[in-house]
């Protein structure tokens, strides 16, 4: 059977918070079967836990943020969450000593490296998948996102940016999930933003950690980063990365196909909530024979670059 996974050892990394611009320390700890993904603020006394749950996502303005009833929050969880989904980690406690996960280079790649450094431990409990049984669609103006039954996990994503630096041919991506393809083709795509927006946010004491080191930055005509893009379709690829992270906020791998047009964190979260609220739209399932699995996770001990 495909088994649940956690980490073999405790790992830690330090980075800068996108919003505060301050140093943030992130610690990942192994967890027992059926613990799920738990985010924990350790700078508070007592510490505050946020289980991965679409209902905990209450702010999607500039990132995906978990907020509890007392207004305590952890921001910018989506790239780490995408890395957990990509590597197939079911059980982990994520400790952070700040109100946000460090932004690192603006992609999921540093988190994938961290998870691989910790090592993967398979647990003697079946991995629980959410299998989509019928289509569910959310619309917002001309934006939409839909998930439908599919024997695997596939994302068909289209963006629509009218910008000289973003070619029309590079605004659509179909991604068939496997750990190997996620790490190789998706995880390195960075977040992006416009210089005018960053300057405005920083004037409002926001996005203080934003820089060329953690994002693709554009003006009205071109990409301002000296090194340019990591690959031609990096913009839409990052949107796929975000969607992988946003959908994994249910704490389980999904068997289904997401199609989306101009979707972002808010629409992704609304879709996930709508699916889980409809008892006829999904079911729990396990995969007894790994040879029959429609999704391929990396083997424990294997390092993919």
UniProtKB/Swiss-Prot annotation:
One of its GO terms (molecular function) is metal ion binding. The active site is at 265 (proton donor). It comes from the Bacteria. Zn(2+) binds at residues 79, 238, 242. It holds the Pfam family LpxC. GO terms for biological process: lipid A biosynthetic process. Its cofactor is Zn(2+). InterPro entries: Ribosomal_Su5_D2-typ_SF, UDP-acyl_GlcNac_deAcase, UDP-acyl_GlcNac_deAcase_C, UDP-acyl_N-AcGlcN_deAcase_N. Pathway: Glycolipid biosynthesis; lipid IV(A) biosynthesis; lipid IV(A) from (3R)-3-hydroxytetradecanoyl-[acyl-carrier-protein] and UDP-N-acetyl-alpha-D-glucosamine: step 2/6. Its EC number is 3.5.1.108. The keyword Repressor does not apply. The keyword Hydrolase applies. It catalyses: a UDP-3-O-[(3R)-3-hydroxyacyl]-N-acetyl-alpha-D-glucosamine + H2O = a UDP-3-O-[(3R)-3-hydroxyacyl]-alpha-D-glucosamine + acetate. Keywords: Hydrolase, Lipid A biosynthesis, Lipid biosynthesis, Lipid metabolism, Metal-binding, Zinc. SUPFAM superfamilies: Ribosomal protein S5 domain 2-like (SSF54211). One of its GO terms (cellular component) is membrane. It is an enzyme of class 3 (hydrolase). Belongs to the LpxC family. Catalyzes the hydrolysis of UDP-3-O-myristoyl-N-acetylglucosamine to form UDP-3-O-myristoylglucosamine and acetate, the committed step in lipid A biosynthesis. This is UDP-3-O-acyl-N-acetylglucosamine deacetylase. The lineage of its organism: Bacteria, Pseudomonadati, Pseudomonadota, Gammaproteobacteria, Vibrionales.
């Amino acid at each position: 059977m495909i088994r649940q996974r956690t980490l073999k050892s405790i790992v830690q990394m330090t980075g800068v918070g996108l919003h505060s611009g301050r140093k943030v320390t992130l610690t990942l700890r192994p967890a027992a079967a059926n613990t799920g993904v738990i985010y924990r603020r350790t700078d508070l006394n007592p510490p505050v836990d946020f289980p991965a749950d679409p209902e905990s996502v209450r702010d999607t303005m500039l990132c995906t943020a978990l907020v509890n009833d007392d207004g305590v929050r952890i921001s910018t969880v989506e790239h780490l969450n995408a890395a957990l989904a990509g590597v197939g980690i079911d059980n982990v406690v994520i400790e952070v000593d700040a109100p946000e996960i460090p932004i690192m280079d603006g992609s999921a790649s540093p988190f994938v490296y961290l998870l691989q450094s910790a090592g993967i431990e398979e647990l003697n409990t079946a991995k629980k998948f959410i299998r989509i049984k019928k289509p569910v669609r959310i619309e917002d103006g001309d934006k939409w996102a839909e998930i439908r039954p599919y024997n695997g996990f596939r994302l068909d994503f289209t963006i629509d940016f009218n910008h000289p630096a973003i070619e029309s041919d590079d605004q659509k991506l179909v991604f068939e999930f496997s750990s190997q393809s996620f790490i190789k083709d998706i995880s390195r795509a960075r977040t992006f933003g416009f210089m005018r927006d960053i300057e405005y946010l920083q004037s409002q004491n926001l996005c203080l950690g934003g820089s060329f080191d953690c994002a693709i930055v554009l003006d009205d005509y071109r990409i301002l980063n000296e090194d340019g893009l990591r690959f031609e379709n990096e913009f839409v690829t990052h949107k796929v990365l975000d969607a992988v992270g946003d959908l994994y906020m249910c704490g389980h791998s999904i068997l289904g196909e997401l199609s989306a047009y101009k979707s972002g964190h808010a629409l992704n979260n609304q879709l996930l909530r709508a699916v889980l609220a409809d008892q006829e739209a999904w079911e729990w399932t396990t995969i007894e024979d790994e040879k029959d699995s429609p999704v391929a996770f990396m083997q424990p001990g294997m390092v993919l670059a």
